[in-house]
Amino acid sequence: MTTILKHLPVGQRIGIAFSGGLDTSAALLWMRQKGAVPYAYTANLGQPDEEDYDAIPRRAMEYGAENARLIDCRKQLVAEGIAAIQCGAFHNTTGGLTYFNTTPLGRAVTGTMLVAAMKEDGVNIWGDGSTYKGNDIERFYRYGLLTNAELQIYKPWLDTDFIDELGGRHEMSEFMIACGFDYKMSVEKAYSTDSNMLGATHEAKDLEYLNSSVKIVNPIMGVKFWDESVKIPAEEVTVRFEQGHPVALNGKTFSDDVEMMLEANRIGGRHGLGMSDQIENRIIEAKSRGIYEAPGMALLHIAYERLLTGIHNEDTIEQYHAHGRQLGRLLYQGRWFDSQALMLRDSLQRWVASQITGEVTLELRRGNDYSILNTVSENLTYKPERLTMEKGDSVFSPDDRIGQLTMRNLDITDTREKLFGYAKTGLLSSSAASGVPQVENLENKGQ
């Protein structure tokens, strides 16, 4: 059976991930007119720039959908976001600022929950608005087929008939008007935005050029912290975790993770926390650039890692970072539910996150400028009395340290011998002015 359909399957049910925007509206209407039977599915991901979710399915019905459903994905989205924080599943960083994989997390939830809803309705053909150059086409492909092995894919934007008739936004707008719908194109921005409750992605158009900075972006989850005319007073905030799960903000306990994430977004957003500019490597290994917002994820991540460093030992922390980066890349590639990702997630949540209990107090200022004011946990292995510089009882004596240093003589001797061995082979240079061989200055060798 062909998995990807190049042309419209006339007379068959097609599920379309319907956002209510111009692209999906025109595609749905076009498919109905050409003889397909479209079903519309809209994911409620708590998008900060969406005002009326209930109106979206109604519009889909007006445009010819056989049926239209609104699928509430918020709870699952937040659950996956918290899992990503527990695992440190983030691999794109620039200058210490992190991209929290908010779009990949959204695609994992959307791709599985919408296809599951389609399967309930007997719809086994799926279409969405992802383009052939991007990451989402592969993410949705993987998650869709994982959820429904019988799934076939039809994308209007890969259909030459659709492209020839409605290849641009102007053509789509004119098509809608000609069909009796008073559809006005939204004002063109200098970039495109995709968002969910965890974060927002701004990319494309002017942002494809690296001389266009964050200053052209209008944040939808925070403030323009770079604009000195925007007043942002400093604010203290406390974040409490229990066994790796965020449970309280500023002393208020949340039983609903969705409400907790919304409040974390409000707190972080007041300062522009979690906004970053990243050059990343797409799945197809071409580089792209995005400007990201994730105020709540950033707030929780900072507090989580503060507790992590005070609770776990060095080797555990090293494994957390290494496995987290690996898991973040799998998430980015659309492999969040693959066996290798599940193995890493289980290990990190079981042996790392389970011990993260405590409370962190921070002072948030402008953007990603913050200070940690206090860290409290019953699981802290940080014990100031162990290494105090003050006179008093100590867990080890000067003689103990002399013995420990003496034992280092063995590997110091081995290292010295290796260095002189490298010098003999020409990898290092040796001179009377230096006690050990050193790498030669390449400039002196004309290289």
From Swiss-Prot:
Compartments, as annotated in UniProt: Cytoplasm
Q: Which residues take part in binding L-aspartate? A: T131, N135, D136
Q: What is its main location?
A: cytoplasm
Native source species: Escherichia coli (strain K12)
GO molecular function terms noted in the UniProt entry: argininosuccinate synthase activity; ATP binding; identical protein binding; protein homodimerization activity
| Gene3D superfamilies linked to this entry | 1.10.287.400, Argininosuccinate synthetase, chain A, domain 2 (3.90.1260.10), HUPs (3.40.50.620)
| Positions contributing to L-citrulline binding | Y99, N135, R139, S192, T201, E203, E280
User: Which NCBIfam families does its entry note?
Assistant: argG, PRK05370.1
What this protein is called in its record is Argininosuccinate synthase
Sequence positions that bind ATP: A17, F18, S19, G20, G21, L22, D23, T24, S25, A43, G129, T131, D136, D194
The Swiss-Prot or TrEMBL record describes its family as follows: Belongs to the argininosuccinate synthase family. Type 2 subfamily.
> What pathway does this protein act in?
Amino-acid biosynthesis; L-arginine biosynthesis; L-arginine from L-ornithine and carbamoyl phosphate: step 2/3
Taxonomy, top ranks, is: Bacteria, Pseudomonadati, Pseudomonadota, Gammaproteobacteria, Enterobacterales
InterPro entries (alphabetical): Arg_succ_synth_type2_subfam (IPR023437), Arginosuc_syn_C (IPR048268), Arginosuc_syn_N (IPR048267), Arginosuc_synth (IPR001518), Arginosuc_synth_CS (IPR018223), Arginosuc_synth_type_1_subfam (IPR023434), AS_cat/multimer_dom_body (IPR024074), AS_multimer_C_tail (IPR024073)
The written remark on domains in the entry is: The monomer is composed of two major structural domains: a nucleotide-binding domain and a catalytic/multimerization domain. Binding of ATP results in a large rigid body conformational change of the nucleotide binding domain.
- Pfam families membership: Arginosuc_syn_C, Arginosuc_synth
Q: What is any one GO biological process for this UniProt entry?
A: argininosuccinate metabolic process
Q: Which UniProt keywords apply?
A: Amino-acid biosynthesis, Arginine biosynthesis, ATP-binding, Cytoplasm, Ligase, Nucleotide-binding
Q: Write out the GO cellular component annotations.
A: cytoplasm; cytosol
Q: Which domain of life is it from?
A: Bacteria
